[in-house]
From Swiss-Prot:
Gene: STG
A Pfam entry, by short name: CASP_dom
Known role: Regulates membrane-cell wall junctions and localized cell wall deposition. Required for establishment of the Casparian strip membrane domain (CSD) and the subsequent formation of Casparian strips, a cell wall modification of the root endodermis that determines an apoplastic barrier between the intraorganismal apoplasm and the extraorganismal apoplasm and prevents lateral diffusion.
Transmembrane parts of this sequence: 65-85, 113-133, 148-168, 201-221
Segments on the Extracellular face: 86-112, 169-200
Compartments reported by the entry: Cell membrane
GO biological processes: cell wall modification; cell-cell junction assembly
Main subcellular location of this protein, as a coarse class: membrane
Keyword list, A-Z: Cell membrane, Cell wall biogenesis/degradation, Membrane, Transmembrane, Transmembrane helix
Stretches in topological domain Cytoplasmic: 1-64, 134-147, 222-226
Protein name: Casparian strip membrane protein 1
Family: Belongs to the Casparian strip membrane proteins (CASP) family.
Membrane topology: Multi-pass membrane protein
Superkingdom classification of source: Eukaryota
């Protein structure tokens, strides 16, 4: 062999007879790469947290009161609408002796009943229109402007409906009992249907008045708490 030719090196392994040459051991990963792998896995698997603006734990009590306000408005809508319908359909004709000699009792002949029907219809329409605003307060209980607006409107509706219910209640009592000093005889002994409808309308309107009182108190307490 000449000195100019490169020498060929044949590796020799110390293995037992019948076994093949051992495989090469895997190269160890650099420390920086090994440390970066768990960090990357933690970064990809960690859940992302989004800020919850509309649903905060601190607003839980305010949201419950706002939801109660929404339910009370639905509950007040039924009696107000029933009072308006019952008053508007109060009409009865009483025949005496012949068909040509009749007595008639109609709601528009009594200003108090006409006022009750208009007030109940306005209150029912207001309650229906206020439901979307109340729903917004449920979703965003931190808003104070809508609460204050609803409080002012509820107070106005409370005064209007109370006046109509009180005026109609006085006429209903006079129709049932009469007045001996003024020589006013009770008419409910003859006009049973008319008195029944007007009495039911007065009861329904006072029920709506009571719910409006709860709405005003609840709204005032919520604003004071904020």
């Amino acid at each position: 062999m000449s000195t100019s030719e490169a020498a060929t090196v044949i590796p020799v392994y110390d293995v037992a007879p019948g076994q093949g040459a051992p495989s090469k051991a895997p190269a160890a990963a650099p420390p920086s790469a090994a440390a970066a792998a768990p960090a990357a896995a933690a970064t990809t698997t960690a859940p992302r947290k989004f800020p919850m603006r509309f649903f905060r734990r601190s607003d839980r009590g305010s949201r419950c009161m706002a939801f109660l306000d929404f339910l009370l408005r639905i509950a007040a809508f039924g009696p107000a609408l029933a009072a308006a319908i019952a008053t508007g359909t109060s009409d009865e004709t009483l025949s005496v002796f012949t068909e040509f000699f009749q007595f008639r009792a109609r709601f528009d002949e009594f200003p108090a009943f006409l006022f009750l029907m208009v007030a109940s219809a306005i209150a029912a329409g207001y309650l229906l229109l206020s439901l979307p605003f109340s729903a917004v307060v449920v979703l965003r209980p931190q808003t104070t402007v809508l609460r204050l607006l609803l409080l002012v409107c509820d107070t106005i509706m409370l005064g209007l409906l109370t006046a109509g219910a009180a005026a109609a209640a006085a006429i209903v009592d006079l129709a049932h009992s009469g007045n001996e000093r003024a020589n006013w005889v009770p008419i409910c002994m003859q006009f049973h249907g008319f008195c029944r409808r007007t009495s039911g309308a007065v009861v329904a309107s006072f029920l709506s008045v009571f719910i409006f009182v709860l709405l005003v108190v609840l709204a005032a307490f919520s604003i004071r708490k904020r």
